């Protein structure tokens, strides 16, 4: 007997599971960065709650951090030809307009692109302050390597909108040195302003390392928070009954997580005080051990980095 479902990083599959949960009424906690349309009123099942956020938020945070934290206002944007890329682009455009940035050039490539040389030649010629890209996973590794090989790192700030330990590990340390990105979670929060969050992140990371031998990455942490939220709701409701779990979360929207405070909204998406951490890649001279990949520089969060409820039909 299945009482609840947690998981799935692929957008199409998570939406398909959500549709089944509408029909069969299961609590569902997906663990991906889901398309913006997923959160439009009427899309999610009554007891589907997503612990991640949307690519729109990723793009908004990336542009906001580039402009406000790094002082880089002339942006060249490279998107991806799918909802991931389009949502990130919409977020970048919104933040750029809000904070006085200018998108001086943009391009778009399909997922799986391996040769970025033509695009990067255009980026180099445009001379932006910052090059923000929507690529992820293997695509991001290929892109960031080629940025380094073509010398872009010396001429502008390289900013991959959403990074993980896996992407960073796939790069030579020299290519990782000085690049920026937003991440959902980084295991080493040394020097961060909120000591309670630092403590919770450190304790969680130690448990994870003790069990698996590597530090937790962003998506492992989305899954951890999703599962934790499910169990907290079950304990409050004293039931796995979907309506009882929904009521437990709706009546008690505030929670503390290993990445700081969060609060569930009407769209079943949590607003995090620290939604994304701005990280800077460490090069060979700074890196002290295998997983010493980034330094946390700043943070983006709060209601302002999320799409408005009105825009989602609420």
Give residue ranges: language-model regions.
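Sec-exported extracytoplasmic/periplasmic mature domains
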Residues: 1-2, 18-26, 67-72, 93-101, ...
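Extracytoplasmic ligand/sensor domains, especially the bilobed periplasmic-binding protein
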Residues: 2-106, 157-181
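Hydrophobic alpha-helical
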Residues: 11-22, 128-150, 226-229
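Short hydrophobic/charged patches on amphipathic alpha-helices used for structural packing
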Residues: 18, 63-64, 117-121, 141
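Extracellular/periplasmic periplasmic-binding protein-like sensory domains
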Residues: 147-224, 235-236, 240, 291-313
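Solvent-exposed, acidic/polar segments of extracytosolic/periplasmic ligand-binding ectodomains
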Residues: 177, 250-314
């Amino acid at each position: 007997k299945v009482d609840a479902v947690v998981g799935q990083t692929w957008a199409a599959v998570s939406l398909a599971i959500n549709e089944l949960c509408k029909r069969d009424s299961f609590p569902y906690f997906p663990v991906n960065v889901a398309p913006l349309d997923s959160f439009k009123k009427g899309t999610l099942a009554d007891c589907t709650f997503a612990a991640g956020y949307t690519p729109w938020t990723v793009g908004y945070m990336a542009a906001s951090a580039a402009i406000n934290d790094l002082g880089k206002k002339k942006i060249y944007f490279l998107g991806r030809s799918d909802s991931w890329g389009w949502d990130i682009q919409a977020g970048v455009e919104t933040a750029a307009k809000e904070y006085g940035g200018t998108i001086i050039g943009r391009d778009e490539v399909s997922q799986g692109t391996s040769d970025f040389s033509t695009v990067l030649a255009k980026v180099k010629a445009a001379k932006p302050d910052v090059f923000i890209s929507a690529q992820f996973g293997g695509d991001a590794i290929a892109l960031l390597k080629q940025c380094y090989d073509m010398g872009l790192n010396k001429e502008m700030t390289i900013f991959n909108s959403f990074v993980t330990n896996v992407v960073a590990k796939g790069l030579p340390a020299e290519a990782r040195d000085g690049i920026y990105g937003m991440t959902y979670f980084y295991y080493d929060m040394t020097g961060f302003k909120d000591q309670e969050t630092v403590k919770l992140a450190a304790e969680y990371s130690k448990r994870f390392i003790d069990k698996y031998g590597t530090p937790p990455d962003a998506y492992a942490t989305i899954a951890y928070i999703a599962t934790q939220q499910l169990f907290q709701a079950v304990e409050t409701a004293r039931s796995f009954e979907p309506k009882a779990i929904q009521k437990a979360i709706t009546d008690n929207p505030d929670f503390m997580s290993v990445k700081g405070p969060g609060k569930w909204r009407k769209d079943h998406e949590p607003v995090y005080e620290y939604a994304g951490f701005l990280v800077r890649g460490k090069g060979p001279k700074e890196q002290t051990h295998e997983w010493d990949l980034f330094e946390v520089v700043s943070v983006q969060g709060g209601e302002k980095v999320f799409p408005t409820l009105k825009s989602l039909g609420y």
